[in-house]
């Protein structure tokens, strides 16, 4: 999906407010693919600055790779202590995307009282964010539902947070 079109549809059904209320109540939210991208502050998809939900600082930009879109299986590099990747830290997951966030939101936030996001990385032309875990908000750039046994385990891991 396109970032701007997704944000437009989310706004039509007041989803930004609903997501914010859910997170404020500590209830888990999982974003997948463009669902992860819209959690960032903005996207420059198609050369137009689009505002996202702003849950994390940073911009979603076009991948800098010889082959775009990135379609296929890639190894991910989760941080130690990851809940989502428990038992699947050395697995490949299925990606299909042309845009991604590349700046660690924890670095953009800097030190302070907020709980810093844990970032999982992957590489396609350059490093990009493959997943983020941040309290009750989790998101993946890849499709766990298309990622076989590893994706099923990741979803089971997320379900333990409910």
Regions found by a protein language model. Give the residues of each.
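Cysteine-nucleophile active-site neighborhood
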Residues: 1-72
């Amino acid at each position: 999906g396109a970032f701007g079109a997704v944000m437009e549809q989310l706004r039509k059904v007041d989803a930004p407010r609903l997501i914010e209320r859910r997170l404020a109540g500590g209830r888990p939210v999982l974003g997948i693919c463009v669902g992860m991208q819209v959690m960032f502050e903005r996207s420059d998809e198609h050369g137009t600055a689009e505002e996202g939900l702003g849950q994390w600082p940073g911009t979603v930009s076009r991948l800098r790779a010889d082959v775009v879109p990135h379609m296929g299986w890639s190894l991910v590099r989760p941080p130690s202590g990851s809940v989502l990747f428990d038992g699947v830290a050395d697995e490949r997951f299925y990606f299909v995307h042309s845009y991604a966030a590349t700046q660690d939101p924890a670095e953009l936030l800097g030190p302070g009282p907020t709980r810093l996001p844990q970032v999982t990385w992957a590489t396609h032309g350059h490093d990009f964010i493959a997943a983020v875990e941040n309290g009750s908000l989790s998101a993946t750039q890849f499709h766990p539902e298309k990622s076989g046994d590893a994706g099923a385990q990741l979803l089971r891991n997320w379900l333990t947070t409910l």
